[in-house]
Amino acid sequence: MPELPEVETVRRGLETLVLGQEIVAVTLKVPKMVKTDLETFALTLPGQIIQSVGRRGKYLLIDLGQLVLVSHLRMEGKYLLFPDEVPDNKHFHVFFELKNGSTLVYQDVRKFGTFDLIAKSQLSAFFAKRKLGPEPKKETFKLKTFEAALLSSQKPIKPHLLDQTLVAGLGNIYVDEVLWAAKVHPETASSRLNKAEIKRLHDETIRILALGIEKGGSTVRTYRNALGADGTMQDYLQVYGQTGKPCPRCGQAIVKLKVGGRGTHICPKCQKKRP
């Protein structure tokens, strides 16, 4: 699943490719992907000009002026731009024809991606309803707020970080990396974390997601950016996908286990489980 660094990389690519372009026609092959009114989606988008491409957590925000097209890539979603003819592909589901003759295509093998066309004035309410946490930046991701939320919850720390309420943008790859860097076992109850662990989790979340953006995201499975290029963050992953390899910190073999139904990579020596 694309996580914050991958979505930010896609955002940057899309802004390069389609900024200022007018949408002249839209073809939708999988109606269930649109979560707002279908008729409004089909009739309103033609004539709209793409003014910017933003991001909030794992959501892409295609700014159309008074409206925003909110796109979530879910497991396998990606965007491709074709300058003229679009090849046949059963996984191409949404086609945005642009005035310059090119077509922006949304591809999704799993068909889990979503689109919401909403008024820009409703954007804050849209994310408030989903209880989306702050962006992982020092200016917005406040340590005291993070600490208070953790200490009031019995939820295991990995599922808690994944639910997007504490901080926006973490997924399975980067949560494993953050927990390893902070030396925290993923099954530790949030309320049992001490102040030093909480600070490490906070600081490593900011650092690791920023590094992921710098490296263009992690190309594992099928991720590519909007320009069709791989990311390089996979070369910097310390524990995710490293089962059986030595921990970069202590040399103990990395193990894989299930936490909250998710495959999870840890160093059993550095991330000891509390009794």
Swiss-Prot record:
UniProt-listed Enzyme Commission number(s): 3.2.2.23, 4.2.99.18
Keyword DNA repair: yes
CDD domains per UniProt: EcFpg-like_N
Binding-site residues, DNA: 91, 110
Active site: 2 (schiff-base intermediate with dna), 3 (proton donor), 58 (proton donor), 262 (proton donor)
InterPro entries attached to this UniProt entry: DNA_glyclase/AP_lyase_DNA-bd, DNA_glyclase_Znf_dom_DNA_BS, Formamido-pyr_DNA_Glyclase, FPG_cat, MutM-like_N-ter, Ribosomal_uS13-like_H2TH, Znf_DNA_glyclase/AP_lyase, Znf_FPG/IleRS
Keywords, sorted A to Z: DNA damage, DNA repair, DNA-binding, Glycosidase, Hydrolase, Lyase, Metal-binding, Multifunctional enzyme, Zinc, Zinc-finger
GO biological process, one term: base-excision repair
Subunit and interaction comment: Monomer.
Role of this protein: Involved in base excision repair of DNA damaged by oxidation or by mutagenic agents. Acts as a DNA glycosylase that recognizes and removes damaged bases. Has a preference for oxidized purines, such as 7,8-dihydro-8-oxoguanine (8-oxoG). Has AP (apurinic/apyrimidinic) lyase activity and introduces nicks in the DNA strand. Cleaves the DNA backbone by beta-delta elimination to generate a single-strand break at the site of the removed base with both 3'- and 5'-phosphates.
Entry protein name: Formamidopyrimidine-DNA glycosylase
Gene: mutM
